[in-house]
Amino acid sequence: MLPSSVAGDTHYASLWVRHGLERQLALLEVAFLLYYGRLSPSAAFLADILECGHRTQFGQRQANASLFDADAHAKCRCIRDLLLFLAIECLNLEAALDVVPEGIAAPDDAALAPLATDPDALERCLVQLEKAASDVAYAPLLLSFALVLRRLDEVGSHTPLEPRLAATLDVVDHGPQIWRRLLQGAFDPSMQLFDTLHSLVTSPLLRTATRALGASNLSALAYRAVFKGLLLTITELVQPEYLPDLDPLVDLWCLTFRAMPGDVPDGIAALCTQFWTQDIQYPTRASLLETVRRRFPASFLPLVRLAHALSGTAPDAPSPDTVTAMMNALAHVPSVALILPLSLIHI
């Protein structure tokens, strides 16, 4: 709340409110960068984030909201985005996307160790996820947890889980596993998964041109790298052919791998390089590209858009390696012939 000495002056009250939001953003960014580059993921901290998100509606419940102007509302949205990025980073999706090593125990797996060694924190997380229907911001979290818990089920099918952990994952009604329920929840139309992901990838946090909120280029690229892991999670869990509409997913890929006008392209080109040198080797990560390539030329635009995005190049920042990789992929397109109607044959 505002001090009484400030509340009576609209100008100073607005400055105070803006400063308070900037402090929240600064603290969250410090926490994100610590977990991104320094600290190991913590299940207890993840549970704290989810509980904080529920209490504050992911930062949207602010005591001084009545004084917000357009800039303050934009900062408030960034607080929501930062909380989501912080929670997703604590889930270590990049490790969860890797192939499960044969015979490994859950506590020894880099992707599972935080949750496997702290069943109480995992249970706290699941309790919060049960409240997901109240806020579409939970959709990316449901998707992320589905990936990690699927991996935990895979490990548990070969190596017995610790009894307390197994009890946490036990399904009382003998229905689908928890990870399947979370995945179904994420894709429920009411959760607006693709709209929420679009909002995340277009957040000012990911822009380097405007230096939004004073964030550095490295911070913006770190958020984009975390989002890339979230993006690959979609096709890791659901084959693109089963999605009712591929266009929203193609949109997300283009926004992730293509720099916005004025943004620094070098770091984003590095994401394209990572895709062509590492991700392309995994069928699930390359499945969207393979799907649009098979559908070409009957469905023309998706492949063209992905080729443009994954080329990793810009007029002022060429990237020959990624362009070459993209051209090699296009060289294996089954056909570039289009079937013309009879009325156009003599044109």
Language-model segments: what does each one mean?
Residues 1-344:
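Extended alpha-helical scaffold regions
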